[in-house]
Amino acid sequence: MDDDGLLINFEVGEGPIKPQIKFTGGRWRERNRLQRSVKRGLTGSQSNDAVADDVGPAPAKRQRLSEGAAPEIQRRFRPQAQGPRSQHVSSRLFTSNPTPVTNFDEPETAPAEEPAEPALPSNAPLSDEAATFAALGLSRRIAQHLSAKLELKAPTAIQHRAVPHLVTTDEDAFLQAQTGSGKTLAYLLPIVNRILALNQNEDGTISKDASKKIHRNSGLLAIVLAPTRELCKQIATVLEKLLRCAPWIVSTTVIGGESKHSEKARIRKGINILIATPGRLKDHLDNTKVLDVSLARWLILDEGDRMMEMGFMDDLKEIVSKMREAPLKKINPDGIQLEPALPTRRVTVLCSATLDHAQVRRLGEYSLEADKTELIKVDGTEAAKEGDEASEAVFAAPSQLKQSYLVVPAKLRLVTLIALLKSSFARRGSVMKAIIFISCADSVDFHFDLLRSPIKEPKEAAAPPTPKKAPKDAGETPDTPPKETKPTKPVTNHTESTVGKACYITSAANTTITLHKLHGSLAQPVRTATLDSFSKSKDPSILITTDISSRGLDVPAVDLVIEYDPAFAVADHVHRIGRTARAGRPGKAVLFLQPGSEEGYVGLLQKNASTALTPQLYDSVLQAGFSSNIDLPPVTATNEDGQDTEQQKQLDSRKQTWTSRAEALQLHLEQRLLASDASSQASNNSGKGFNSKKGASTKLGKPAPKSSDGATGTLLASGRQAFRSHIRAYATHVRDERVYFDMTQLHLGHMAKAFGLREAPGGIGAGVQRRTVKPSAANGGGKKSTKGDDGDGLDKQDDDEAERTRRMKKMMRMVGAGASEFNIG
């Protein structure tokens, strides 16, 4: 017994001891508020496993403190009040993630039948010996040019079906075939062949009589309309190569973003084939008197269904009505009889990889004649010709295209994307070019800046002033003072803000990977230069883009397409994955989906897919991508010479697993965003906002150069803006697909992790600032563009803003405002 003669034993369980905190002093209201906040914090910590684990088991016996114990020891065991939470809290990547619905172990998730041999390409040229261009009814001059100069030995299935019909008849036609099957040549070859026939003698030779020869002043004979500027440029390139066998036939383009004065000058000189976007063509028909369509025999609507979706229906109606108002002339100004070589009526051709019955009916109401319309459809290896009914199903992708989908939680999206790119470019020559489709322009800008190396490259052209040329006259000596010369204009680099070297995804095999970005808010010269750089790049390259690049673009050697954000409609998905596996080449397409309701989206895609979509979990991609070291760039520009000690520990992979590497990479990305904001505030206190006009700084702590879209700001501000735009874009799926992309099931905090943010920013429904393109040298001119100058699109500013605006108007009740940054083209 003790000295007082009483001993009481209390049994205390092994559970954690709840700290009892009592506040003294101050006002009663303040003490009560603190007491309630601490109580809420303790309750939340008990429900959180990660925090509950930090509270150890109760000790076997309470430690006794003597009366003379040091104050430091007494304070150590005294319960302390819980302080304010840290401003930046980083959650773990592999905890609290939703469970996928797909069972990856079931054999039903795999393709039903594994073919013993690879699938034969469905959009490749025909191998039949009889299938030659000469057998299609084309002239010998064109057939020889295709085989000798363009190296095209045989036509594709759609060309084999469409060219004879358009050469011999004057009927309207629908051309429906898989992506990459040669639909452009399917309508260009008949046009050039029939125009060329005006210059031919009866024996097929070219007439030498100048009075019977077609030239640029013979009149406009064909008009080709396309929804985007990039597609118009591509069609013009194909037509230019084709017309090398007939250089007297002249073509040109009129598109938004270019100088209307220059376009009018080209039209005034004379053209035979015009390639245009609907808005700009309507503008010229209203204001350019020299543009005469009375001789036009063809109206081609390339991706016509897309033009209607983008809101060009009113423009198309006015174009068709103006062409019908002009009486069709049979003799051109030179007195050449156009018939019967050319059609006796205006022929309208609609071509696309996706056509449904509703769109055909809507377009046919005002542009086609029902009794003179032919549907020419090629489905895979089987060619079918149907007259009255159009299939309502979305057209299938090429059979040689390998499709798969990744089930990735929201928190792991960013690191999984980097791991997929790193593993895809791990071997030299494995993937030369890849395209990443993202939903909105702000997200494209952010991911480009994040994956772009922060280390500035030395300028190649940093040479001293150009030396003076040697004197040409014999009497001159080096001591003779040089003659005054006019200062040369500096060469504008349009790709300075859209092309750069990639980081995180390089390997020993591919030490240099070029990164590109493309969206509709960029100026037209920048868009053209960026696409040209990506197409002609000989190094491994990646293009981060919106849906502006999903239709019609034919970029060589694209082996991988990544849909980082799912398409807004199934038809858009078909066109996205159609950027690879073109003209018989193999290709691979990967779709990112989140666990839960989004997994049901696969069933919708599988209905009309020619091949099965293979499911894949994110862990296999992370293991393949993070099996080796990750080259982390410096967080700030002040640390370019070497990494921090903490990052050096992260790079030591001898004891690291793929999970720890993924978490280290995510932590590095978050620190990089925070460092960009901190360095910006330290360099200039006035440049705090994303849209600050003065004093804005980059993630490297240096003054931020104005990008092609006129925006400046830190990487952290860019990530927040990209997050807001992504959430708004998530709500714009078509009605039939919203059951799979449910806003109520989207975890905003986890999604913020995919943008390198540690918490979800607010202001999602408060509207966005409209992008403005300021006149600069990088934008291709000094004149300020107005709505009337562009003439392309609903607001005559961007040809791709119309569709996003239309869809966002439907969602204004949910998100609160329209969004102009969703430029998908």
From Swiss-Prot:
Any one GO BP annotation for this protein: endonucleolytic cleavage in ITS1 upstream of 5.8S rRNA from tricistronic rRNA transcript (SSU-rRNA, 5.8S rRNA, LSU-rRNA)
SUPFAM superfamilies named among the record's database cross-references: P-loop containing nucleoside triphosphate hydrolases (SSF52540)
Database matches in InterPro entries: DEAD/DEAH_box_helicase_dom (IPR011545), Helicase_ATP-bd (IPR014001), Helicase_C-like (IPR001650), P-loop_NTPase (IPR027417), SPB4-like_CTE (IPR025313)
Alphabetized PANTHER family for the sequence: RNA HELICASE
Record's protein name: ATP-dependent RNA helicase DBP7
Region (Disordered): 21-125, 457-495, 632-657, 676-713, 764-825
Motif, DEAD box: chain positions: 302-305
Gene Ontology CC terms, in alphabetical order: nucleolus
CDD domains: DEADc_DDX31, SF2_C_DEAD
Cellular compartment(s): Nucleus, Nucleolus
Organism per entry: Pyricularia oryzae (strain 70-15 / ATCC MYA-4617 / FGSC 8958) (Rice blast fungus)
Superkingdom in the source lineage: Eukaryota
Bias type Basic and acidic residues, positions: 470-487, 646-655, 786-796
Other information: Present with 1460 molecules/cell in log phase SD medium.
Domain named Helicase ATP-binding: residues: 164-373
Binding of ATP, residues: 177-184
Residue window of motif Q motif: 131-160
Annotated ranges, domain Helicase C-terminal: 400-625
SMART domains assigned to the protein according to its UniProt record, in alphabetical order: DEXDc, DUF4217, HELICc
